[in-house]
Amino acid sequence: MTHTISGQYGRDTIVLETGNWAKQAHGAVVYKSGNLVLLATVCAADDAKEGQDFFPLTCEYTEKLYSVGRFPGGYFKREAKPPEHEILISRIIDRPIRPLFPEGYFCEVQLQVQVLSADGDVSVAGHALNAASVALTISDIPFNGPIAGARIGRINGELILNPTTKEIVNSDLDLVVAGTKTHIVMIEGEAKELSNEEMLSALRFAQKHIAEFVTLQEEYAKQIGVVKREVKLKARDVELLAKVKEYAFAKLTAANQTPDKTVRNKEISNVNKDVVEFFKQTVEDADKIKDIKTYLHELEYEIVREQVLNQGVRFDGRRLDEIRPISVEINPLPGPHGSSVFTRGQTQSLGVVTLGTGSDNQRYETLEGQKEKSFMLHYNFPAFSVGEVRRSSGPGRREIGHGNLAERALKLVLPKSEEFPYVIRVVSEILESNGSSSMASVCSGSLALMAAGVPIKGSVSGIAMGLFSDSSGKYAVLSDIAGLEDHFGDMDCKIAGTRKGITAFQMDLKVTGVSFDVLESVFEQAQRGRFHILDIMEKHISKASDSLAGTAPRIIVRNIPKDRIGELIGPGGKNVRGISELTGAELYIEDDGRVTISGSNQESAEKAAKMVDGFFAEVEVGKIYEGKVKRIADFGAFVEILPGKEGLCHISKIDFKRVNSVKDIVKEGDIIRVKVLNVDKTGKIDLSRKDALEEI
């Protein structure tokens, strides 16, 4: 049976249809908004795999290029490995949905959202999250939703729900927010140095609209008559759990007081081994032994949280708002254009900056067409940073997500291309990690940009905030969380910004929502922490270096008329190649007439710029030019005084004395000085070497 419902979501009319397409999926919905058509499907295994002790959820967002009537690029002409922007939207779907499955539910779940028809004015991220929630809500799969997603922009101080692709360009805020009827569960976005109050106002605005779409989903599920599966949870051995707690509580409590991550992990491991060996004397069942390991993890969770909530004590002895010790190094590497090392506790990021030219832009394909990026931040998280051994491969979803967050934090303080015409690549190499490595990347990246001479608007710092809460409403907000506190806490909230305001924000929860009272506490405490970090960073470098590295390219920009681009390029690129061969510089010409000239040194770039200027300069009567003899005739020499502009120096004007043969005085290829005597109506140029010599 087909079920359809429609409703208003801000300015958009949303239509939901099920029962016609993808009927064998456990949940499927066709989601429409204007010309945007999404198909969201979800399937779940009937039972968890034997021995499964985690929730295997896969979320995949895919853009089909046929949705805009285009062929995919590449040899095979089909969609292949997902590009970064699809991975980022997949993560936006995954992060708010994951904590809303029942605790202990370990059946494999696969959620897919596909763009079947695109609308160039509609931004997809919020709609994709909505479609995913609808598919889960109307399925028989256990899910503590529904939730809704909202993309929030702000233009001239006015908040906008689901701004168009054109509106978002002029917005000083770009947030994707997910929530239930009453609480926010996920935030991801960037802002142009907005205040805490402005950010909270945007979140309240989002929450109001989110509640509307959650209500629509509830009505839809009621219309369909959804019946959820029974969750099969493994029975707990209460007696064994009590014995484990009695034997291990004091040992685990002592081990958890160790501030050093490596030492602490070893001590916890030793306690766990000791407990397992002790109970093996009386417990023979292998499944029971595995249960003991689970109970030990639960006990550690209980110990860490009890210390924070009831004693106000963190495992490493810090106050709740205390930042770990910070150290900074500027330009530790001699070869790169700029570098820094930012260390906070046992988290360390090496930030490295490379300056490039227009040809180094990153080009990528989206539903809107080909796009280019002139700033990129790449985040690398090698196994050695956490003392592990694993196969090295390309960046995973986590690395792409962390890099994107740090990139968004920094890109809004970069100078405009007119002021600093370089392509910029920042790489964050995580050398060691104990929590908050993405925010360490923001700090090392900001420092390295200044060290490289990039005139950013201000230093940017980032901090990760945590939350411990209980069912009574008691909570504690933690600044600069370590890996242990991230693992056992309820929230990982990352906030980056300058002294003026916030530039990037990301929040993920392990609980079903967080109140605005808590969010206000988080923002206020995070700001104090960010400013403390900025104080330390700015003691080492507070403004961009006055000069670029010797190995950095030198760039000069020229703007030429769009209708004369072809003149500069020349037939088959002849002119551009000629300039490059003569000067060693490279030219990058954009469709709007912007010409970026880059040389390995200033002299090379200036020489090429002078030649570019020559193509569009007007010949001035009475001016002396240095030109190249291009051809020789019996009656004179043809001299190129500007690129593409030749004049005739008659034999009578080549020298003071009588000249029998032009070749007696000049030869092809000679560089000579000539004076412009006249330019007639047809553009013919009359030159004189003799007059130029008189003025020397």
Swiss-Prot record:
The keyword RNA-binding applies. One of its GO terms (cellular component) is cytosol. This is Polyribonucleotide nucleotidyltransferase. Involved in mRNA degradation. Catalyzes the phosphorolysis of single-stranded polyribonucleotides processively in the 3'- to 5'-direction. Its EC number is 2.7.7.8. It is an enzyme of class 2 (transferase). Residues 622-690 form the S1 motif domain. Its cofactor is Mg(2+). Mg(2+) binds at residues 486, 492. Its main location: cytoplasm. It holds the Pfam family S1.
